[in-house]
């Protein structure tokens, strides 16, 4: 193989790897995707009921966990029913949540759920990818007897 062919082959491999690798921005969910995930979860619950839906929502190989996006579901009293990132929090009250800066964002979620029924709350949280404390925004929507959330880190 001549040197020019070797360079061409290496260049082609580099180009192909760049095309097949997701862009860094694609590695993380967006606000629009968080809203869409919540809406899909609400529709799925309406279709099959919460008992079956929560199994799907907790399935790390399923359709409701995508990169760093996942859906959290709680009852109207704030008790978590679905929490795939931290299953040990299922059964715990979300409305008591406080971020690392002391912001009581759980109460903000409660106010949106009880008031307009949908909206966004911002707080600081440890990013599991970088290990750093980052701003996070969570979309909240109430449907039926449940409150649905999905959040994104502001990178």
Name what the model sees in each region.
Residues 2-15, 20-155:
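N-terminal membrane-sensor/transducer module of prokaryotic signaling receptors
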